[in-house]
Design a protein with these regions (language model features):
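Alpha-solenoid helical repeat architecture
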Residues: 2-8, 39-56, 80-96, 121-136, ...
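Residue at a conserved register position within TPR or TPR-like alpha-solenoid repeats
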Residues: 14, 18-19, 100-101, 141, ...
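Helix-turn-helix repeat elements of alpha-solenoid scaffolds
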Residues: 1, 19-36, 61-77, 102-117, ...
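Flexible inter-repeat linkers and adjacent short helices
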Residues: 1-73, 83, 281-286, 291-311
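TPR/TPR-like (Sel1-like) alpha-helical repeat modules
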Residues: 30-34, 268-283, 319
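Helix-turn-helix DNA-binding segment
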Residues: 326-375, 379-381, 388-403
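Structural register within alpha-helical repeat arrays
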Residues: 14, 55-59, 96-98, 137, ...
Length: 403
């Protein structure tokens, strides 16, 4: 009996620990189910989502299972829901809907049958599953161009969770709302989240906050700071590789590719190719298409990856998202108007109310050179006077507020 309990506990660790992959789980779960059915084992509860708005990319990455989602739904639904208890209420239906969503399917019909189960999830299940369903609904609404409906879905869910004291979910809900701001080009609102709630500590990475780190990198890209975005993403590299986080790796590689592209670093090609190869292996579409207008120019320059059918579907969905959200991750200052390092230094001095002569002395350049740079800066910022340049620079986050 003690041996069975020990084996059962080890199996539970395989099922519950987020750093353990899903290889072998299809065999482990029925074995644990048998022990539970025979009342030879009891298991503690655990979060299947890690407080994230996703089942497929929550406590574990279930990309491998997505390849056989129909078969696994039929054969694993009963044992999975039995093993997980409260955590399993609504899980199977939500999981297959999300799997199909990632593959580019219109899941509005599936959501119509899933949403009525929310009351059951609320009564018999867990808030983790409730957030997963709400998050999937919001994502499907965004994919259909219904950004106002998506915001209402998440704002309403957040208010309910706050009222019930479910505070551990709020940081990821706020990050999701920030992504909606970015989709709609509401950069001031996104910046408010960034300064008040983003982790912003690359020296002390917490992988449980990975959804927030990815959101943080998106804000940095929108603020025209690809270098900052790369610094935010870099600490996640080892985690997504060592823990087989395929979906997270696609997001990380796409965002890194966008940052490199904007830095005119040709290494973006390798990063985007990695993302495409992973997505194509699982037939995922929306994992990449969600980046719409931000990733479209890169895809147009890159040779095709994956089958012709998959690539055609991907490009169609990317263009659809680009049409719905034309300002997503677009920097405040157009790429063609990006300031050179020298111009940025001179802009800081202009905003500090230094004269051209003082700037020439500080930078050790000729006065005529300063005047030329200042003229270029005014043109790029679309202003005529130095005082206007100061206001524009602050609005574009090119200089600190105290200057």
């Amino acid at each position: 009996a003690a041996g069975k309990q020990a084996r059962g506990r080890l199996a539970w660790l395989d099922i519950s620990l987020p750093q353990r992959g899903v290889d072998g789980l299809a065999a482990t779960i029925p074995a644990v189910f048998t022990l539970l059915t025979n009342k030879e084992l009891t298991l503690p509860s655990f979060s299947v989502t890690s407080a994230l708005p996703s089942l497929m990319n929550g406590g574990k990455d279930f990309s491998e299972w997505s390849k056989k989602d129909d078969l696994l739904y039929k054969t694993m639904r009963i044992p999975v829901e039995a093993i997980l208890g409260r955590d399993g209420v609504g899980l199977a239906d939500c999981a297959i809907a999300e799997s199909r969503f990632e593959k580019g399917e219109n899941i509005s019909g599936r959501m119509l049958s899933l949403i009525p189960k929310v009351n059951e999830i609320r009564q018999r299940g867990t808030p983790d599953m409730e957030f997963a369903v709400g998050g999937l609904l919001a994502r499907s609404q965004l994919a259909s161009g219904q950004s106002e409906d998506a915001r209402h879905t998440m704002v309403s869910l957040r208010a309910q969770f706050a009222e019930r004291g479910l505070t551990r979910f709020l940081p990821n809900m706020d990050a999701m709302l920030c992504r909606m701001d970015l989709l709609n080009g509401e950069l001031d609102s996104a910046d408010a989240w960034y300064h008040e709630k983003a982790p912003r500590d690359p020296m002390h990475i917490n992988v449980m906050k990975r959804y927030q780190y990815l959101t943080q990198a998106m804000v940095e890209l929108a603020d025209g700071r690809p270098d900052a975005a790369r610094l935010t993403l870099a600490p996640l590299e080892a985690y997504v590789k060592n823990c087989a986080r395929y979906i997270d790796s696609v997001h990380l590689h796409v965002l890194t590719a966008i940052a490199l592209y904007r830095q005119k670093d040709d290494a973006w090609r390798g990063r985007l190719t990695q993302a495409l190869e992973t997505a194509a292996a699982y037939r995922f579409i929306r994992t990449i298409s969600v980046y719409g207008t931000a990733v479209l120019p890169l895809l147009e320059e890159l040779e095709r990856v994956g089958s012709a059918k998959w690539h055609k579907q991907l490009m169609s969905e990317v263009r659809t998202q680009a049409a719905y959200y034309p300002n997503f991750l677009q920097p405040r200052l157009a790429l063609s108007d990006t300031l050179t390092p020298m111009e940025l230094q001179i802009l800081h001095l202009v905003c500090a109310d230094k004269s051209n002569a003082e700037i020439a002395e500080i930078m050790n350049i000729k006065l005529s050179t300063v005047k030329t740079h200042v003229s270029h800066i005014l043109t790029k910022l679309d202003v005529k006077r130095r005082s206007e340049a100061k206001t524009a620079a602050r609005k574009l986050r090119l200089v600190p507020e105290h200057l």
